[in-house]
Amino acid sequence: MNYYQILKITGIILLIFSLFILIPISAAFFYGESIDNFLQSFLIIFFVGLLAYFPNKKERSQIKIREGFLIVAIFWFVLSFFGAIPFLMDESLKFSLVDAVFESASGWTTTGATVVSNIDNLNKPLLLYRQLLQWLGG
């Protein structure tokens, strides 16, 4: 099993996901809301992606079926946890880690389940982020 190749692909996935967080940042600018939570989330996810990718960027071996299955499993867990960061950083939600990961995993799996009691009161960039997770997952 080539763990370096798996780590490299995980880094690429995180780098791509971090770029999608720029969309809610743009929405926050448009609506005049704070970008701090999303900007911090972007930076965390982007730099973790860089840390996973760059040490392994010269790895060129073929991915076998076993590694492909592991990459898909890691994909779901990693994106669910890193997708929870904006929910954790939003002070209006007061989410625990479990609630934030549940909300993120719900978006990635497009189940539509939520722990938010009044979705209409969320700020617009966070609403956009929730829908973006569902779009990316679907």
Regions found by a protein language model. Name each.
Residues M1-G138:
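Membrane-proximal intracellular helices of multi-pass ion channels
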